[in-house]
Amino acid sequence: MLDRLAFLQQLPLLLKGTSDDDTPCPGYLYEEFAKISYESVGSCQCLLEYLLNRLQTSSCHVKLKVLKILLSLCFHGSPQFIQDLRRNSAYIQEAAAVSGPPDPLHGISLYQKVRVTAQEIVGNLFSESIPSPSHTVSAKERSQSGMGSQASSAPALHGFGYSQEEKNLGNSKDTFLNGIQRAAVAVTHSVLPGAGLSHTHACERADDAYKPVAIPSTDRRPLPGNSLPTSAHRGCHRSGVPGGGWDESDSGNSSQESPHDKSPLSRSSDVGSKSGSDGQSRNSQRESLDITDRVEFTHLSDCQQEARLVQEVTWGKRVFLTQEESQQFVRGCSLLNCEVVFEMLNCSLTDDSNCIKLRSMCAISSLMASDLLSHEHMLAVVRQNLQTLTGGPPGPVKDKATKILRQFQALTQNFSERGAVHHETSPSPTTHCSLDLFADVIPHSVVSGLLTSLSVPSSPTLNVQNTVCSLPNGAANQKNPNGSTEKSDPAEELRVETGDHISTNIHVSLFEGMELVGTMKCSHKEDTIGYRAGGLSVEPAKEEPSKPTLSSVFSFLNT
């Protein structure tokens, strides 16, 4: 009765191992079932009864799991369980002939596996290869084989591939006594470490004795049998010293070691001690040197990718960057430190090669079009070098630098008058007060000519025409106040003739007297239009100098 109550505690494991699903039985449950068979005779009978009842179910999954458990117990179960299984082998033989309708998913494969496993169990039950009770090791003894320091004759934990070609382990009485002895030794070791050491392993544990932890050295190594002195590795504490006031291990005996046995770090500390400094100054000097080296190494390693990117952009066969190169450069800047890249581009503007300068300025223009850096920051970095380039000789470098400065002026809107670019073609002091962004495209002289009014107001051109028209046609030369003769310009003669021709043939227009502005398209006709207006306004200007009268179809309105 007590065995059955104890068996009920193992029922969850049995239900898990024989569940009706596709999941295989976990491997650790096979060992648990073997332990149940060794607990008592009643537990062994209850286990066999439960497994045979589960074998009678109609599910092939349950049958297959039960047969695999029985096959495992044939090799690792108790002798009592194997003997009872032989008496009830009819259930196994019945499972060896099982068949049924095919499964929708697996077909008849499950039935084949069940039959093969059942036939294997029957063959192992009645064969001579089954280990005898005297050679069988209990599960409790196998579980204690890994605790503490076991004897050399202790059996190893064998799996399914265990072969019988092992030495004789003795009878069950000796095995039981050996298990009790190993358990006692394990308990003694856990309570009193180092007690109960056997003499057989004394020599093996001699080399495993505790040794103080030592820092490995590349130049020298201690002998295997001798342990390092603990005083040489014990640090000395000083209050008020950076780093907690702890000296390194080589600072205490640095004066006693030979120069050949010292590491480079200890040699640097010895040099500091010979110069008259104490241990505190040596530590401070060593820390400062380490920090400097570390900062320099980090700086160089951090800027390598930026320098490589700038080198790829500035060094090329073409003078200007292609669209693909500009996009690739901006994409690379977004992944790296943009400020460092821009400073390197600024340094490239001082190069002697014009190609490098132009490619650098193209890269700067690409960064201006992106939002990686602010325009104020970019202008503050490259302003001086760009102004230097604009003051250089005429050429593409000067034009490109001028264009970039004008772009910065329009983007930042706070560019001072001192930084504005001065034109060589406009020496008047009023031209540099405000800059035109498109001055490079359309010259300033052409723009002023195209925007000339076609109205009647008095102009130098009109006065010259009237003066020339009053002279005879044969007078080609004039006298200056100094008495010298000056030959008239052929263009002026053409302008006079055109004016005379228009004055004789007057055409009335609806748009006379209106303020007209010449268009940008017909720049070659502006002189003709101007002459026509000038010719029409000669005689009315003499009648009323204050208010010129025009010949128009709307003249009747002036009453």
From Swiss-Prot:
The lineage of its organism: Eukaryota, Metazoa, Chordata, Craniata, Vertebrata. One of its GO terms (cellular component) is cytosol. It comes from Xenopus laevis. It is found in: Golgi apparatus, trans-Golgi network membrane; Cytoplasmic vesicle; Cytoplasm, Cytosol. Residues 144-154, 266-281 have a biased composition (Low complexity). Residues 131-157, 214-290, 472-491 are annotated as: Disordered. It is a peripheral membrane protein. It holds the Pfam family ENTH. This is AP-4 complex accessory subunit tepsin. InterPro entries: ENTH, ENTH/VHS_tepsin, ENTH_VHS, TEPSIN. Its main location: Golgi. Residues 472-485 have a biased composition (Polar residues). It comes from the Eukaryota.
